[in-house]
Amino acid sequence: MLSPKRTRFRKQHRGRMKGISYRGNHISFGKYALQALEPAWITSRQIEAGRRAMTRNARRGGKIWVRIFPDKPVTVRPAETRMGSGKGSPEYWVAVVKPGRILYEMGGVTENIARRAISIASSKMPIRTQFIISG
């Protein structure tokens, strides 16, 4: 599972996801990519599940790049706890994804293999996505 080695602060505000992604919205490494169409928090488990699905489907050959990293801690309160007494402890990590953001890239395979692998990875994501080709 992906997570930062160390952070400056243990806990973060939840924040808002306004507008579209201006960074990381162009294909940089591969030829094919999976692009987000909705805003969401994508957990490190979901990122890993998508990566595994793509790797398994592409078999040998082809390279996969994960273009998002979960750097936001999400805190959870214990069950049946009364209000107050501070913020919960960090439970898992999420990547903040805005519309237009590239999630995964793929290269070194034919289009139909890439399309199939990326469609399987997109089914692991909690948002609507689209398959795009560079050029």
UniProtKB/Swiss-Prot annotation:
Q: Spell out the CDD domains in the cross-references.
A: Ribosomal_L16_L10e
Q: Name one GO molecular function term.
A: structural constituent of ribosome
Q: Where in the cell is it found?
A: Plastid, Chloroplast
Q: Which HAMAP family match?
A: Ribosomal_uL16
Question: What's the source species' lineage?
Answer: Eukaryota, Viridiplantae, Streptophyta, Embryophyta, Tracheophyta
Offer one example of a GO biological process linked to this entry: mitochondrial translation
Q: Does the keyword Signal apply?
A: no
This protein's species is Daucus carota
Name the source's superkingdom.
Answer: Eukaryota
Give the keywords, sorted: Chloroplast, Plastid, Ribonucleoprotein, Ribosomal protein
* Gene Ontology cellular-component annotations: chloroplast; mitochondrial large ribosomal subunit
The family line of this record is:
Belongs to the universal ribosomal protein uL16 family.
| Descriptive protein name | Large ribosomal subunit protein uL16c
Fetch the PROSITE patterns from UniProt. Answer: RIBOSOMAL_L16_1, RIBOSOMAL_L16_2
Does the keyword Nucleotidyltransferase feature in the UniProt annotation?
no
What InterPro entries does the database record attribute to this sequence? Answer: Ribosomal_uL16, Ribosomal_uL16_bact-type, Ribosomal_uL16_CS, Ribosomal_uL16_dom, Ribosomal_uL16_sf
Q: How does it assemble?
A: Part of the 50S ribosomal subunit.
